[in-house]
Amino acid sequence: VGGPGIVPRGGRQVVTALPARGEVWWCELPEAGRRPVVVLSRDAAIPRLRRALIGPCTTRIRGIPTEVRLEPGDDPVPRVSAVNLDAVESVAIATLVERLGRLGDERMHQICEAIEVAVGCRP
């Protein structure tokens, strides 16, 4: 079955960890394929909705205010990439297939600032 939540195993169900805000996961996106994403949803919403708001990562780095650059070693990503906050979307948590790690507080602060720009709350 894959992904977090309740996974059947040998006639019984095993609860696996849910994603949490600030974590980076491999995600199976229908249009973009498998790519790392950053979970943006507040933790309380994820188990209720069974969905998470995510920011997809891309290796096409444009250096614009709605992106946050991620670096292997500093961040849990396999390659230098950027979180694209112009492409935020809600996905079923079943599409989150493998946890890569958690971003630090400073990186999440940068992401919050980029979201403000992406939605027009800050120029």
Cite the ranges covered by each PLM segment:
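Conserved functional hotspots at enzyme active or ligand-binding sites that engage polyanionic ligands
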Residues: 1-123
